[in-house]
Each structure stands twice: as C-alpha cells, then as structure tokens.
Regions:
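A detector of single, family-specific signature residues
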Residues: 1-168
C-alpha cells in the first residue's frame, strides 16, 4: 500500500509541470482559445481537440470530421436489406473522449444544448433517443470544425511566446 501511495506521489510530481504547460498552451494558442468559448470545452479538451483535428481545412465538411472521429454509424447492407450498425470507432479515441466529456455537460441547465439534449432523451425512437450524448458529441465536433476553419492559418499558429503564470 505504501509503495502504491509513493508511486502516486511521484506521478503527481511529474504531472504538475505538464499540466502547467498544457494550460499555458491552451491560454495562448488562438485555436485553443476559440474552442474554449464553446460550452463544455475546457483547457484540456481544447488542447486535445485542437491537436487531433489539426488543420480543419483538410476536411471538406463537418461530417468528414465526425467520420474521422469515429462517431459515424456503420451501415450493413445486403441485397434489399439495410440495417444500421454500430459506431465505427475509427480514428482517435482521445478525440472521442474529449467530445464525450464536452457533450456530457450539455445536460446541465445552463448549457445552450440543454433543450436539444433533453428533446433527444425524451424521444424513444431511433438511435438518438437511446443516446442523446452521441448526438451532442457530433454537434460539438461540427462546431469545433467550423470554428477552426474560420480561423484559418491562425488556428494552427504557434502560441504567443510569452509564458503566463498558471495557478496550480
């Protein structure tokens, strides 16, 4: 037990400087700043989404980003039968995690997506009725796509080199 607690303390000591660097990066990089303006996206989700999407202009539409994240539904079809499958789960699991974390905040009353989330949750037909969080995840990724695409080159620019103080 003491060994495990010591290891946790060692890892915490290693994590704290990295946490500070990521927070500084998120505060100074324009793409991350823009992503953090969306409800539910904090500094960690912003950095992950920014890093995983990269240049949003490489996607011709927001749907391609949703497919890239693996949040699209596969379809099985044979002859005249066509049945919806499951999530493709192709792409980055980190991007899916960040989108999920941001989407879970949509159930809160202060969220701009609260009405959308609860409307889907009340609906019992179709896939969205089963998982309104998935629909909100897609919606958030589409917003992120448009935000980064509008920024253009500024979304990818290196952050301001002046470091800011971060409260631990």
């Amino acid at each position: 037990m003491d060994t495990a607690l010591r290891r946790i303390d060692e890892l915490t000591a290693e994590i704290q400087p990295l946490r500070g660097q990521l927070i500084n990066f998120a505060r100074r990089q324009r793409g991350c700043q823009a992503l953090q303006r969306h409800y539910g996206i904090g500094w960690l989700c912003a950095v992950i989404i920014w890093a995983e999407i990269g240049d949003a202009r490489r996607f011709s539409s927001s749907y391609q980003l949703v497919r890239f994240a693996g949040l699209d539904i596969t379809v099985y079809s044979s002859d005249s039968k066509r049945s919806p499958g499951h999530l493709s789960h192709q792409g980055s699991p980190e991007l899916r995690w960040a989108a999920f974390e941001a989407a879970k905040s949509a159930a809160r009353r202060s969220s701009p997506d609260c009405g959308y989330y609860h409307k889907l949750a009340a609906k019992h037909d179709g896939h969205n009725g089963k998982n309104p969080t998935l629909a909100v995840e897609r919606k958030i990724l589409r917003r992120c796509y448009h935000t980064l695409r509008e920024l253009g080159d500024a979304a990818l620019a290196l952050p301001d080199p002046r470091p800011q103080q971060v409260a631990a």
